[in-house]
Amino acid sequence: MKAQLIDRLSRYVKIDTQSNPESSTTPSTEKQWDLLRLLQQELEGFGLETNLDDNGYLFATLESNVSFDVPTVGFLAHVDTSPDFNASNVNPQIVEQYDGKTIKLGDTGRVLSQETFPELKKLIGHTLMITDGTSLLGADDKAGVVEIMEAVKYLIEHPEIKHGRIRIAFTPDEEIGRGPHKFDVERFNADFAYTMDGSEFGELQFESFNAAEANITTHGVNVHPGSAKNIMVNAISLGHQFHSLLPAGEVPERTEDYEGFYHLMKFEGNVEKATLQYIIRDHDRESFELRKKKLLEIRDDINVHYEDFPVKVDIEDQYYNMAEKIEPHPYIIDIPKKVFNDLNIEPNTAPIRGGTDGSQLSFKGLPTPNIFTGCGNFHGPFEYASIDVMEKAVQVIIGIAQEVTHHHK
C-alpha cells in the first residue's frame, strides 16, 4: 500500500488549496475547489454516490454490506492548507529508510534534524515525505484525505470485509477556523464520526480546548508632547498596562498538558488608538470562564482611573471542549481503542492543545474524536509525513468500519 499512499499524497499536495482568513466566501479560496472536484471525480470512480454543495462540502456514501442495522460512522478530513506559510509549487521529496541523520531541505539552508525535532527519533527506518524547504507540505490534512480515500478503496476491493454504512466528508477552511460553520450535520446523517487530522502515531483525541478570541481596544488622547502633562493619554501605554496585568506564566510558551493560557496574537496602534488581539484557551470550562472574566476585571481596573473609560473588551467564544459531548457516549472511544489494541497501537489520549473540526461538530450533534495521521511540524517548511504511519492509519479506518458492525442499533 505504500506506493499508493505516496502516489496519492504526492498528487494531492501539489494542488494549492491554501485558505484565506481575509476572505468572506466559502470556501475562502477558489483553489480549494480544484482538489474537491478531483476527489468527487475519484470517489465517483469508486462507484460511490457523492454530493458537493455550493459551500465546498463534499459528502459521499459507502453503503453497508451487512443485513442488520448498525450505526452509521463518518470519516472526515479537510482539504485546505494553512495560510501561515507558502503553499504554492509544493515539491514533495521522498526519504526512504530514514536513518536519523540531518536532512537538507533543498537549497534553502533549512534542515530537518532530530536536535530541533526530537520526535523524528521515533521514525527511524520509515519512509518520509518532506518538503524542499520552499513551502509547507500540506499533509495537514491531505494525509487524512489520502488515508480515507485508500481505506474506502480497500473496503470496496475487499467485500469480504463487513462494514455498516460509512459517510465520508471532505471540508474547506478548517485552518481558518470555519470548517464546520456550514457543515450540514443533518444531511451528513451519521451517528458519530472521526476526523483524520491528528499528528503522531497513536493519537486518539477526544478532549480539546475551550476557545475564545478577545479584542481589546484602547483609546488615547493625543496632544503635542511638549505640553502633554496631565492631558495626554497614550493608547499604546494603556495596551501595555493591560497586557502586563495578565499572569506572566500563563502563555503558550510556558504551559503544557491541561494548562490554559492567554496568547497575544497582535498588538498595534498609535497614541490615539491601539488594539490587542488575544486567543484564550483552557480545557476546563470553569477555568475558561474565569479567564474571560479576568479580562473584564483588568478593563475595569484601568478604566476606574479615567472619566471616559478608554479600554474596551470584546470577547467571542470560538469552540468548546468536545469531551462534553463525547464522554456521554463511551463506545465512540471504545471502538477505536479496540482497533488500536488489535493493531498493537498504544493509544495516546492526551488532550489536544488546540481544536479540530470535531470540536465544533460535536456541539452541533455529531460527536467526532480525532485520530492520528502520521504527520508533524504542520504549517511550515519542516512539515513531514511518515508513510509507514499513514499505512497504519488506513488500517485503523478499516478496523473501525469492521468494529462498528458489532454495535447493533
Curated annotation (Swiss-Prot):
Query: What is the annotated localization of this protein?
Result: Cytoplasm
- What EC numbers are recorded for this enzyme? 3.4.11.4
Q: Which catalytic residues are annotated?
A: D80, E174 (proton acceptor)
Q: What class of enzyme is it?
A: hydrolase
Q: GO biological process annotations for this chain's record?
A: peptide catabolic process; proteolysis
Q: Which GO-annotated molecular functions does the record name?
A: metallopeptidase activity; tripeptide aminopeptidase activity; zinc ion binding
Coiled-coil boundaries: none
Going by the UniProt record, its keywords in alphabetical order are: Aminopeptidase, Cytoplasm, Hydrolase, Metal-binding, Metalloprotease, Protease, Zinc
Q: Which reaction does it catalyse?
A: Release of the N-terminal residue from a tripeptide
Q: Which CDD domains match?
A: M20_peptT (cd03892)
Q: Which SUPFAM superfamilies match?
A: Bacterial exopeptidase dimerisation domain, Zn-dependent exopeptidases
Residue numbers binding Zn(2+) 1 = H78, D140, D197
Lineage, top-rank taxon, reads Bacteria
Keyword Nuclease assigned = no
As cofactor, the record names:
Zn(2+)
Q: Which family does it belong to?
A: Belongs to the peptidase M20B family.
User: Which HAMAP family does the UniProt entry name for this protein?
Assistant: Aminopeptidase_M20 (MF_00550)
Tell me what this protein is called: Peptidase T
This chain's source organism reads: Staphylococcus haemolyticus (strain JCSC1435)
Question: Which taxonomic lineage is given here?
Answer: Bacteria, Bacillati, Bacillota, Bacilli, Bacillales
